[in-house]
């Protein structure tokens, strides 16, 4: 199954869960998880968990236009650093929602999806820059979309985890 190119690019680029322990009225405390930290750059992305142990260190992701608009060309530029080589067998767990309705929940071969952004496995350790232009169809139904992508190596080590929330078309 092929994913939409913009979603694939966002997945690969492509988590800081902030916790606090407020005092409780009942005399005990509970951890509160705040929204994820934003990914640097002009984009709607957030990390979905603490990224310090991730294989992909994302330096920046820039989208133009941001937010993406139906019927336009989406320009993507991302820069980062891979701390390990990514080989065949890597995968992405993807969920796309339209409002509260889940449109897609799938586990896909990351290497097969990388061809949509002109990359291929293996991805070598070191700095990476991705630039891509994607024509977005004008027929994208109006509404709010959410994308969650959790990306792993073939050995189940986390590459990255990203959320794009409340994308309005």
Curated annotation (Swiss-Prot):
Entries under CDD domains matching the protein: PG-PI_TP
Listed SUPFAM superfamilies: E set domains
Keywords assigned by UniProt, alphabetized: Lipid transport, Secreted, Signal, Transport
Signal peptide: 1-19
Record's subcellular location: Secreted
The family this protein is said to belong to: Belongs to the NPC2 family.
Known function: Catalyzes the intermembrane transfer of phosphatidylglycerol and phosphatidylinositol.
Protein name: Phosphatidylglycerol/phosphatidylinositol transfer protein
Protein source organism: Emericella nidulans (strain FGSC A4 / ATCC 38163 / CBS 112.46 / NRRL 194 / M139)
Gene: npc2
């Amino acid at each position: 199954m092929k994913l939409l190119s913009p979603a694939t690019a966002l997945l690969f680029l492509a988590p800081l869960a902030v916790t606090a322990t407020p005092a409780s009225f009942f005399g005990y405390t509970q951890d509160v998880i705040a929204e994820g930290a934003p990914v640097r750059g002009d984009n709607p992305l957030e990390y979905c968990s603490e990224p310090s142990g991730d294989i992909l260190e994302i330096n920046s992701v820039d989208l133009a236009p941001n937010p993406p608009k139906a019927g336009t060309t989406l320009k993507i530029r991302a820069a980062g650093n891979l701390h390990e080589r990514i080989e065949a067998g890597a995968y992405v767990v993807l969920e796309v929602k339209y409002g509260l309705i889940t449109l897609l929940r799938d586990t896909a071969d990351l290497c097969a999806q990388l061809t949509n952004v002109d990359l291929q496995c293996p991805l070598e350790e070191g700095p990476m820059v991705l630039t891509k232009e994607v024509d977005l169809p004008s027929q994208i139904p109006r509404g709010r979309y959410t994308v969650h992508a959790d990306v792993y190596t073939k050995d189940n080590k986390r590459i990255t985890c990203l959320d794009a929330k409340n994308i309005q078309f």
